[in-house]
Amino acid sequence: MNFNATLFGQTVAFILFVWFCMKFVWPPLMNAIEERQKKIADGLADAGRAAKDLELAQIKATEQLKEAKVTANEIIEQANKRKAQIVEEAKVEAQTERAKIIAQGQAEIENERNRVKDDLRKQVALLAIAGAEKILERTIDPEAHSDIVNKLVAEI
């Protein structure tokens, strides 16, 4: 057995094996590793961007919520002002209507009072004439009667 030839054969076989691996096995493995590294790096970058996007979205949502609250408060304030304005207008309108109704009532009362006074004057005049007729025991003619009633009404 020749130790040198075996060693030389094994060395040649090992060199061929290394060359074959370097030529055909190693490049696909390196490409697969590089692709995996790239995917991992892209995934980490995407995760970082997603975290930043999430943070920005949360900030934006918080700002929109604050704006919505401010807008809601403004709308409520406007509604309260409008409510107060409507109530005030209703009060003014009610006061005007009240004054109008009171004025109408007072005018009706005054008209009724004047009518009653006139009726009362006529009745008093008739009673006075009736009393005078009894006192005088004579009847006054209708023309004189009307004249006397009108004079008494005017005096009363």
Swiss-Prot record:
The protein's location, in the record's own words, is:
Cell inner membrane
Q: Which Gene3D superfamilies match?
A: F1F0 ATP synthase subunit B, membrane domain
Q: Which domain of life is it from?
A: Bacteria
A Pfam family hit: ATP-synt_B
Q: Which UniProt keywords are given for this protein, alphabetically ordered?
A: ATP synthesis, Cell inner membrane, Cell membrane, CF(0), Hydrogen ion transport, Ion transport, Membrane, Transmembrane, Transmembrane helix, Transport
Membrane spanning stretches: 7-29
InterPro entries, per database record: ATP_synth_B-like_membr_sf, ATP_synth_b/b'su_bac/chlpt, ATP_synth_F0_bsu_bac, ATP_synthase_B_chain
Q: Care to name a GO molecular-function term for this sequence?
A: proton-transporting ATP synthase activity, rotational mechanism
Identify the GO cellular component terms for this protein: plasma membrane; proton-transporting ATP synthase complex
The membrane topology of this protein is: Single-pass membrane protein
Q: Which family does it belong to?
A: Belongs to the ATPase B chain family.
Q: What does the subunit section of this Swiss-Prot or TrEMBL entry state?
A: F-type ATPases have 2 components, F(1) - the catalytic core - and F(0) - the membrane proton channel. F(1) has five subunits: alpha(3), beta(3), gamma(1), delta(1), epsilon(1). F(0) has three main subunits: a(1), b(2) and c(10-14). The alpha and beta chains form an alternating ring which encloses part of the gamma chain. F(1) is attached to F(0) by a central stalk formed by the gamma and epsilon chains, while a peripheral stalk is formed by the delta and b chains.
* Biological role: F(1)F(0) ATP synthase produces ATP from ADP in the presence of a proton or sodium gradient. F-type ATPases consist of two structural domains, F(1) containing the extramembraneous catalytic core and F(0) containing the membrane proton channel, linked together by a central stalk and a peripheral stalk. During catalysis, ATP synthesis in the catalytic domain of F(1) is coupled via a rotary mechanism of the central stalk subunits to proton translocation.
Task: Tell me the protein's name.
Answer: ATP synthase subunit b
